[in-house]
Amino acid sequence: MKKFIALLAALSISVSLSGQDDKVLFTGIDASMDCFLPLDRKVYPSFGLGARVRLGRPDQWVNLVSGVRYIHGKRLSGFQVPILVNVNLLRGKRFSGYLGGGFEFDFAGTYYGAMKYQAGLAGRHFDLRVFYKPYQGDLGTGFTFYF
């Protein structure tokens, strides 16, 4: 709990390097494509649509991302809820490059979720990322448009 409070404190006191407004809560729509790595020499693509919320701006050190999406494919179909922390290592006035990680809860049968790692580019109105979930052998890409 102390680490979580420290993370929120770091997010709230992060100093802005740009002239952006003070908005720190962004909501958006999300689209993704997952490509489950082959178990039997077949690739199983899945497609997802959902909504995301980002707490923090691209010019701050840390962003917290969550949301819900529905993924559909041959290997996995169901709702997923990611809770991720992104660290903006390459911060600019309008864009940032980040590394992130967290847990993605799944509501598909007896499977409950997996750790998720990602790297991407973020702007005020978008997030473009590549992610990997080692437990599932899931390599994918996603795009979020924030309003």
Predicted features by range, described:
Residues 3, 132-141:
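Short glycine/proline-enriched turn or capping motifs at secondary-structure junctions
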Residues 9-10, 139-147:
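A signal for specific C-terminal beta-sheet/loop modules enriched in small/flexible residues
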Residues 23-27, 41-49, 75-81, 95-97, ...:
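Residues that define the transmembrane beta-barrel architecture of outer-membrane proteins
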Residues 27-39, 61-72, 96-107, 124-136:
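Transmembrane beta-strand segments that form the barrel wall of outer-membrane beta-barrel proteins
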Residues 52-58, 86-92, 120-126, 133, ...:
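Structural signature of outer-membrane beta-barrel channels/translocons
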Residues 48-109:
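Gram-negative (and chloroplast) outer-membrane scaffold detector with strong preference
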Residues 1-26:
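Cleavable N-terminal export/targeting peptides
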Residues 19-57, 61-63, 144-146:
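Short glycine/proline- and aromatic-enriched beta-strand/turn motifs that initiate or cap beta-hairpins
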